[in-house]
């Protein structure tokens, strides 16, 4: 989803707020709470989880280990939820033809709010480059902007899961907007 006008192109960069991250953070949180609850119920000697016979689990050593796994899972789950909350890796690509600049903005990095701008004059943009690597279990599609005097700037990351036709369409739209050629594969 991008916003296009004759002189402005804004493309959001999806950070860590993805369905898969929500799913895994929820599963890990549920599992950690389950381990912690079973370990605690073995400590007090009462069955706090009715479907399980957790009162039959000895606190030493099984209950202690389950409490440890539960606490470790809570720490890992809280880390995932913080990356989702702060949307680590999120930002936008913005191309302003009027000012003749390409601006890359990344909002959050490692829990700190970081404003990162990369300003590139549009006259230095050479091509839009598509890189496709496919294997049996994994395919990697990345869209780059080749700029004179700089390393290739990634525009669409692997985690965006473009299929080949979507990536070609996006590359064609961007190349047409910037009036540059496409370099492929």
UniProtKB/Swiss-Prot annotation:
Membrane topology of the entry: Multi-pass membrane protein
Regions crossing the membrane: 22-42, 57-77, 101-121
Pfam families noted in UniProt: Ycf4
Similarity field: Belongs to the Ycf4 family.
Protein name (database record): Photosystem I assembly protein Ycf4
GO biological process annotation, one example: photosynthesis
Cellular compartment(s): Plastid, Chloroplast thylakoid membrane
Main subcellular location: plastid
InterPro entries: PSI_Ycf4_assembly
Gene: ycf4
UniProt keywords, alphabetically: Chloroplast, Membrane, Photosynthesis, Plastid, Thylakoid, Transmembrane, Transmembrane helix
Role summary: Seems to be required for the assembly of the photosystem I complex.
């Amino acid at each position: 989803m991008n916003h296009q006008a004759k002189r402005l192109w804004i493309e959001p960069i999806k950070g860590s707020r993805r369905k898969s991250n929500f799913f895994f953070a929820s599963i890990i949180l549920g599992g950690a709470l389950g381990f912690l609850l079973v370990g605690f119920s073995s400590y007090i000697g009462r069955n706090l989880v009715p479907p399980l016979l957790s009162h039959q689990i000895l606190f030493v050593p099984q209950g202690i280990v389950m409490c440890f796994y539960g606490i470790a899972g809570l720490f890992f789950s809280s880390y995932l939820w913080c990356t989702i909350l702060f949307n680590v890796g999120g930002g936008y690509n913005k191309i302003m033809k009027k000012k003749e600049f390409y601006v890359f903005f990344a909002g959050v990095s490692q829990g700190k709010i970081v404003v990162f701008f990369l300003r590139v004059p549009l006259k230095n943009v050479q091509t839009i480059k598509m890189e496709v690597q496919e294997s049996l279990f994994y395919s990697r599609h990345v869209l780059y902007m080749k700029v004179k005097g700089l390393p290739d700037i990634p525009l669409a990351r692997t985690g965006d899961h473009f299929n080949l036709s979507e990536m070609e369409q996006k590359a064609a739209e961007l190349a047409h907007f910037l009036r540059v050629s496409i370099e492929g594969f």
